[in-house]
Amino acid sequence: MGFRVLVLVVMATTFALPFTFFEEPGRSPFRPALRSEEAQALRHGLTLLLARRADGQPPDMRQPEMRRPEMRRPEVRQPEFAELSVGQRRWDVDQCMYYCLTGVVGYSYTECETMCT
């Protein structure tokens, strides 16, 4: 019962609003208008998306320059095991893991373990 009353109140309120509330017919003053170039870009993007879906391709519409650059893994030179003592090897692996895990790139533990061992 309460939901029906709420719906009726909302319908009556929106019907009772004067048409001068809107700046232009069909356009709300609270929603910013799209500029013509933005509207054209939006239409173009939607056209590309629909074309890709029709072709069965993934819907990645971003331009190549807007895509996130691929992160390259830093090359970690592993010294020969004969060169280092057991304690030195363990320290180097631990240091490699520390720098890998706390670095800017944000590798997972498994990725760091693969690179450092």
UniProtKB/Swiss-Prot annotation:
GO molecular function: potassium channel regulator activity; toxin activity
Alphabetically ordered keywords of this record: Cleavage on pair of basic residues, Disulfide bond, Ion channel impairing toxin, Neurotoxin, Potassium channel impairing toxin, Secreted, Signal, Toxin
Basic and acidic residues bias locations: 62-77
Entry comment describing in which tissues the protein is expressed: Expressed by the venom duct.
Keyword Secreted on entry: yes
Transmembrane segments: none
Gene Ontology CC: one annotated term: extracellular region
Keyword Secreted: yes
Residue ranges listed under propeptide: 23-90
Main localization (coarse): secreted
Domain of life: Eukaryota
Disulfide cross-links: 96-116, 100-112
Region feature Disordered, mapped onto this chain: 53-77
Residues spanning the signal sequence: 1-22
Cell location: Secreted
Family named by the database record: Belongs to the conotoxin R superfamily.
Domain notes: The cysteine framework is XIV (C-C-C-C).
Record's protein name: Conotoxin vil14.2
